[in-house]
C-alpha cells in the first residue's frame, strides 16, 4: 500500500494546446501498479474546457465540484454534477469542462490510454444546449 497526500503534488496550469479557458490539472496517482493507470484532478473555471479529443482506452470522470458539461461528437452536450460519473469508451471523440456560467471539477481515470488532442471546442458549441 502506498499513500499519496493530495497536497504533495501541486496543480499546474492546463496545457493551452489542449484546453480553452482557465483550467488546472494535478496528477494524483504516482505509483506503478503494473497497469498503465493515470489519475488526474482537473479543475475548470468558468469557460474552461478541454479540446475535442479521443483516448485509446477507457476514461472515467467522477464529478467532485460544481457542474461539468460533457459532449460526445454528434450528440448534444449534457451536464453532470457532484456525485455523477461519466464513462467514455476508447475512440469516442468528446470534450468536457465547466458548464457555462460556473466552475466544475472532476477526477479523471484513464486506463491503458493515450490521448489524441484535436481541435478546440468553439464558443458556439460550448454554449449550445
Please give the residue ranges for each predicted region.
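Ligand-binding loop in jelly-roll beta-barrel domains
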Residues: 33, 69, 76-77, 81-82, ...
Amino acid at each position: 500500500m502506498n499513500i499519496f497526500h493530495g497536497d504533495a503534488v501541486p496543480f499546474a496550469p492546463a496545457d493551452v494546446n489542449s484546453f480553452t479557458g482557465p483550467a488546472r490539472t494535478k496528477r494524483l496517482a504516482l505509483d506503478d501498479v503494473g497497469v498503465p493507470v493515470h489519475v488526474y484532478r482537473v479543475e475548470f473555471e468558468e469557460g474552461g474546457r478541454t479540446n475535442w479529443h479521443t483516448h485509446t482506452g477507457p476514461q472515467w470522470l467522477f464529478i467532485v465540484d460544481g457542474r461539468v458539461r460533457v459532449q460526445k461528437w454528434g450528440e448534444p452536450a449534457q451536464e453532470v454534477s457532484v456525485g455523477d460519473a461519466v464513462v467514455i469508451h476508447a475512440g469516442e471523440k468528446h470534450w468536457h469542462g465547466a458548464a457555462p456560467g460556473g466552475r466544475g471539477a472532476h477526477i479523471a481515470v484513464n486506463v491503458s490510454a493515450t490521448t489524441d488532442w484535436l481541435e478546440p471546442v468553439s464558443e458556439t458549441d460550448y454554449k449550445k444546449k
